């Protein structure tokens, strides 16, 4: 009778470590939620800027004046910065989730299937050090 391929289980972490990883996961998800709120607010601001630019163009203003009058450069820079922020928050939250799942005993393959990513990505992110939060 052919044997079933064995799935390598990650060794379960201590309950203290799992608790710390759970706290980190919750914190990073909260940070991501906050970044998403800031992103939504910035996108609303950007929408207002674009609407103003469109109206200025519609009113016959020269294109070379519209960007300056609508403060497009400032809005673009702020939007780019907030998108980078939400991408970083997403990465930290995902890494925390992967580490928690691994500590709870899930395999890299199980985690990858659940998130729709490659096992290699999960493995790499689980090995990444968690960045220490800056104290303010």
Question: Model-derived features: where do they sit?
Answer:
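Short, Lys/Arg-enriched N-terminal segment that forms or immediately precedes the first helix
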Residues: 73-87
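Short, amphipathic alpha-helical "recognition" segments used to contact nucleic acids or chromatin
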Residues: 90-106
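Short alpha-helical "recognition helix" segments of helix-turn-helix
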Residues: 107-117, 122
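General nucleic-acid-binding
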Residues: 2-70
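Short, solvent-exposed alpha-helical "recognition" segments
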Residues: 89-92, 124-136
